[in-house]
């Protein structure tokens, strides 16, 4: 395992410097905040000491966190874990430019840290499991039946015309039918929205630009429906799915799709491109061999190379005001709490960039001039235009890759049990120690796991090959509860069946992203909000203030690092007048 390529010992400064004066104060050392600092100083807009980052955590990266478990020589992911090669900012920063050059060795790197892009293996559907309503299938069972002109009948009472469709196919069928029922869409994009003659498959060749043209004006044309003639943007996704394929069809999609978060009652117009994904030519999922949080460290290191650059860790923003004694030189006075000393101190800045999701914004002083609900009604409404989606992750270390007994090597299995899915992450070639991710990032299961994760008795680590108790005990405070491990093992055994003997884990690693200050693992737009208007609004909510809100939460790629990068880039170009990055393809579409 290479720990040399990416420097993850980026210096963090947990101290304080009362009355510090800066041009730009960035709150949040997640990907959007780090990217903003990197661009402002490398573009020579400001010097390093004029742009400072503050974060209440003792680490950087926000909701990216890669860890190595004792006895294993590879990284596991507690947060975001992959990117799509169609996401050009993140791909270029990781792989170099130009992206049109297929040979990665011939590309020019943007950042000094050398990240190694590797495929994010989705596994083989003919081996991976789907366990729903107490029936066990291989994930390709639907398409296998279709090859023989049969329909796979499950224990879901689907409408007759929907029987035999896999969950992916049924999602696509719904989206196809709604798009084609709008005569303008059907006429304008008929070459790009294709139904396969086999009756099950649909192909969408729509670009992000196409979707942005479609989303605000797509009409739901289904006479007799409660939602007939309404904008799809104003219909909840659950409402729409039930209307198209019945409540039982909805249950099938919610369970077999693997994520309840995809089928919550969020904005249908935003859900469509999210569900279809970017299937433009050669788009693949990748990750970084050095851990996916390497992208955060590499961007941070590029900023930190500049003299005076600093990331103030363990410093929490409490409030900010314009009413202070230095209004002639600095617009805002920030009050920060230094966590180690438990004392407050002041920072003065002319621009404020809040690289924060909804919950973090709500934890700031809601009575200051910016958030004051009686005066800033529109801002408060728009802050609440997104749904916070809970996400728990639990990594488990086993002394052998027991899933190989089922001929499974990578990918994930899906179930309607509260665990929802598990990813088979990797195996150390020497020790055979192996990692599994139990990921229940979901709305409906949150209370099930919360009752278990709140218990006081934590899992006790056990020594394993090349994993000393001393090394393992360092992870004592991040163990899942014994309750949770017991329940998860019970569900893993039910999901995989009697044909495999599943041993107990020797170590776990638990992260609940619902905890403050994140409040959620990712976010989703509510139905009825004009996303086209809210996105640019959030990047500068008040016309006469230099205060900007960025991050994945209010982006059109929620849950992706690219969403955070695109919002930061648009904010920088519009409000800081930065030029288009020299390393980014000029044709790349950044969205609204």
Feature-to-residue mapping (PLM):
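Extreme N-terminal leader/targeting segments of oxidoreductases
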Residues: 1-24, 42-48, 591-592
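Mid-domain catalytic core of redox enzymes
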Residues: 313-447
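Active-site/ligand-binding neighborhood in enzyme catalytic cores
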Residues: 190, 194-319, 323-331, 335, ...
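Glycine-rich Rossmann-fold phosphate-binding loop(s) that bind the pyrophosphate
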Residues: 28-32
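Conserved FAD-binding subdomain of flavin-dependent enzymes
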Residues: 72-118
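Mobile amphipathic helical/loop "lid" adjacent to a hydrophobic cofactor/ligand pocket
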Residues: 106-262
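Glycine-rich FAD pyrophosphate-binding loop
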Residues: 41-70
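Conserved flavin/dinucleotide-binding core of flavoenzymes
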Residues: 2-11, 406-592
């Amino acid at each position: 395992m290479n720990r040399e390529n990416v420097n993850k010992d980026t210096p963090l400064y947990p101290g304080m410097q009362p009355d510090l004066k800066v041009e730009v104060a960035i709150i949040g050392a997640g990907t959007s905040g780090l990217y903003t600092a990197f661009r402002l100083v490398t573009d020579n807009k400001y010097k390093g000491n004029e742009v400072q980052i503050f974060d209440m955590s003792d680490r950087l990266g926000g909701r990216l966190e890669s860890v190595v478990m004792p006895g294993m020589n590879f990284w596991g992911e507690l947060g975001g874990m992959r990117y799509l090669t169609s996401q050009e900012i993140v791909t270029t920063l990781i792989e170099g430019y130009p992206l049109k050059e297929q040979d990665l060795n011939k590309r020019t790197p943007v950042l000094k840290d050398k990240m190694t892009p590797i495929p994010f293996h989705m596994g083989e559907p003919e081996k991976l499991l789907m366990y729903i309503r107490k029936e066990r299938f291989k994930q390709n069972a639907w398409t296998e039946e279709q090859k023989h002109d049969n329909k796979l009948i499950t224990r879901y009472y689907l409408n007759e015309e929907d029987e035999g469709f896999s969950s992916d196919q049924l999602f696509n069928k719904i989206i196809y039918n709604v798009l084609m029922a709008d005569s303008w869409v059907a006429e304008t994009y008929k070459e790009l929205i294709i139904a396969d003659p086999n009756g099950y498959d649909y192909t969408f060749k729509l670009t992000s630009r196409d979707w942005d043209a479609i989303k605000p004006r797509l009409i739901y044309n289904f006479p007799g429906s409660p939602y007939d003639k309404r904008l799809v943007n104003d219909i909840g996704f659950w409402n729409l799915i039930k209307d198209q394929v019945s409540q039982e069809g909805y249950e099938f999609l919610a369970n077999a799709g693997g994520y309840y978060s995809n089928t919550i009652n969020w904005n249908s117009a935003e859900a469509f491109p999210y569900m279809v994904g970017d299937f433009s030519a050669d788009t693949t999922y990748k990750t970084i061999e050095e851990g996916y949080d390497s992208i955060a460290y590499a961007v941070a290191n590029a900023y930190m190379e500049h003299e005076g650059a600093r990331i103030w860790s363990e410093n929490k923003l409490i409030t900010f005001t314009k009413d202070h004694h230095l209004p002639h030189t600095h617009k805002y006075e920030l009050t920060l709490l230094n966590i180690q000393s438990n004392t407050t101190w002041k920072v003065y800045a002319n621009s404020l960039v809040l690289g924060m999701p909804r919950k973090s914004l709500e934890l700031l002083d809601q009575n200051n001039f910016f958030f004051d609900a009686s005066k800033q009604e529109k801002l408060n409404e728009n802050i609440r235009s997104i749904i916070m989606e809970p996400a728990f992750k639990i990594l488990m270390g086993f002394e052998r890759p027991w899933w190989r007994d089922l001929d499974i090597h990578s990918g994930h299995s899906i179930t309607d049990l509260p665990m929802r899915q598990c990813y088979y992450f990797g195996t150390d070639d020497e020790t055979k120690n192996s990692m599994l991710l139990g990921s229940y990032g979901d709305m409906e299961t949150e209370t099930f796991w919360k009752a278990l994760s709140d218990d006081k008795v934590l899992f006790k680590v056990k020594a394993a090959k090349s994993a000393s108790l001393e090394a393992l005990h360092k992870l004592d405070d991040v163990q899942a509860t014994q309750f949770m491990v017991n329940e998860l093992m019970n569900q893993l055994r039910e999901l995989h069946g009697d044909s495999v003997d599943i041993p107990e884990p020797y170590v776990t690693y638990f992260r609940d992203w619902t905890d403050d200050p994140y409040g959620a693992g990712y976010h989703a737009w509510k139905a009825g909000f004009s996303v086209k208007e809210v996105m640019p609004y959030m990047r500068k909510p008040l016309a006469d203030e230099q205060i900007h809100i960025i991050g994945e939460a209010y982006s059109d790629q929620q849950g992706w690092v690219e969403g955070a990068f695109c919002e930061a880039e648009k904010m920088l170009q519009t409000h800081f007048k930065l030029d288009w990055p020299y390393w980014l393809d000029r044709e790349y579409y950044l969205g609204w």
